[in-house]
Design a protein with these regions (language model features):
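Conserved helix/coil segment N-terminal to the catalytic DExD/H
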Residues: 42-60, 65-81, 95
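Conserved helicase motor
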Residues: 35-44, 65-70, 94-97, 286-290, ...
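Conserved Walker A/P-loop ATP-binding site and its immediately adjacent core
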Residues: 3-25, 123-128, 287-289
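Conserved Helicase C-terminal RecA-like lobe
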Residues: 1-11, 77, 190-212, 222-348, ...
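Conserved P-loop NTPase motor "coupling/switch" region that bridges the ATPase
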Residues: 6-7, 25, 32-33, 41, ...
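Conserved nucleic-acid-binding Ia/Ib motif block in the N-terminal RecA-like helicase ATPase lobe
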Residues: 10-55, 59-60, 309
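A conserved SF2-helicase RecA2
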Residues: 363-421
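SF2 helicase motor core recognition
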Residues: 69-72, 124-126, 292-296, 322, ...
Length: 421
């Protein structure tokens, strides 16, 4: 730590809030870690706050990729003058001429130490590695993307501008591995069979204002409505949970209105990383039918044409459900399973995937516990990963805390209902 006093971490927006929590849990030395989220003013204030970080503390700034190249932010990050720059999920800078990639190259050139972290640094295109290594160590593959492409890619197609194949991949891999450390889940013997990860989602300002209004109105109604029952509290929490997922059910309306895509955008990143480019299968659980429908529409847009998604929810006939599960388990082209947690969370086997995303959960611990076992059961040969999409400072966090305590909200919510709002 004597040589590294200031660290800059660049990560996907949903991962940025995880970094301070990880430092708190695992660092055995003093750390001040600030997340650079929110408005431009807030981000600049947080960067400025780190300038006064005590010399005996490691100072860490964590920012999302989409912000790093913005006017004002980029210059402030340069002034921060990090000793170590970390690219978390470094495949986000695989496109050599993207603004965020170019910004990262410049920040990397200023830093003494650099680190990239990725489960899939090379996805569908071996050429993806150049931009990441241009940041990490420009001496490995050189400064010229086009020279690199000429060395390892076979060009063809219209005007000879399309990559139609690759050459000397053994040489490319040898150079890549010369400064890389790779370990699989199977090789990580100290890794638990089940790993849990939280991805935090920011609520847009307009929806946050609406959320706060509904939250305050709910508290007022409960305080002035006489006897508080579990049913009345859960009904109001349900509405807040729907809003956290991006949907609002207006009074008297038959159908919910989509008011935000923040959670869907976070899920989109995961599907692209794990399925589209990682070549893996994925299970997604959601509580509400409109969420399931929205996820299916998202999948239709981003999955390759020869890849499919299936869904299992309450409206599916029971005699059709086995076929849907079987298709996901056996068909290599069926790569995404979207399940309504109350319907698909019990009694089925989904071991074709080793990763499960929770878009939303219900209030029942038993249902949640059962859903964990859909991918973690006999027939699973890999360690399992569970990713929670959580809107910060919302009912999502309260539900997560209750479920981690193995509580059923329907049984505990009456005694201290205000804590859930």
């Amino acid at each position: 730590m004597g040589e590294v006093k200031r660290v800059l971490v660049i990560a996907p927006a949903s991962v940025v809030p995880v970094w301070p929590k990880e430092f708190d849990e695992y660092a055995d030395f003093p750390v001040m870690c600030k997340t650079l989220l929110g408005s431009k003013k807030q981000r600049l204030e947080n960067i400025s706050g780190l300038k006064g970080c005590h010399n005996k503390k490691l100072c860490v700034a964590a920012v999302n990729y989409e912000s790093v190249w913005r006017d004002g932010i980029f210059e402030a990050l340069q002034d921060y003058d990090a000793d170590l720059v970390v690219c978390d999920e470094s495949q986000r800078i695989k496109t050599h001429d993207a603004k965020q990639s170019k910004a990262m190259h410049q920040l990397g050139d200023m830093a003494r130490y650099k680190l990239i972290l990725s489960g899939t640094p090379v996805q569908n295109n071996a050429i993806d590695i150049w931009s990441q290594y241009r940041f990490l160590d420009r001496t490995v593959f050189g400064d010229s993307y086009y020279a690199f492409r000429g060395r390892y890619a076979v060009m063809g197609g219209f005007n000879n501008k399309q990559i139609v194949g690759y050459k000397d991949l053994d040489g490319l891999i040898k150079k890549e591995h010369s400064i890389a450390f790779r370990i699989t889940k199977e090789e990580a013997v100290d890794l638990p069979e089940q790993t849990f990860e939280v991805r935090y989602v920011g609520m847009p300002a307009k929806e946050r204002k609406l959320y706060e209004k509904i939250r305050k109105d709910s508290i007022t109604e409960l305080e002035s409505g006489g006897k508080v029952t579990a049913a009345t509290v859960l009904t109001k929490l349900l509405r807040l949970q729907q809003l956290a997922g991006g949907f609002l059910v207006k009074d008297g309306a038959d159908k919910p209105e989509k008011v935000s895509t923040a959670k869907l955008d976070a899920l989109k990143d995961i599907i692209i990383d794990y399925v589209v480019e990682g070549g893996r299968k994925l299970v997604v659980f959601a509580r509400f039918i409109p969420e399931v429908d929205a996820i299916l529409k998202l999948a239709e847009k981003i999955l390759p044409k020869n890849r499919k998604a299936v869904a299992l929810y309450g409206g599916i006939k029971k005699n059709e459900r086995g076929g849907i599960v079987g298709q996901f388990q056996t068909d290599p082209d069926t790569v995404l399973f979207v399940g309504q947690i109350d319907t698909a969370g019990t009694g089925i086997t989904l071991t074709a995937a080793d990763t499960c995303v929770y878009y939303s959960k219900n209030f029942n611990y038993a249902t949640y516990e059962q859903s964990l076992s859909r991918i973690h059961r006999i027939g699973q040969v890999n360690r399992c990963t569970y990713i929670d999409l959580v809107v910060g400072d919302s009912v999502d966090e309260k539900i997560n805390i209750a479920l981690m305590k193995k509580e059923n909200l329907a049984e505990t919510v009456v005694d201290n209902w205000k804590q859930y709002f």
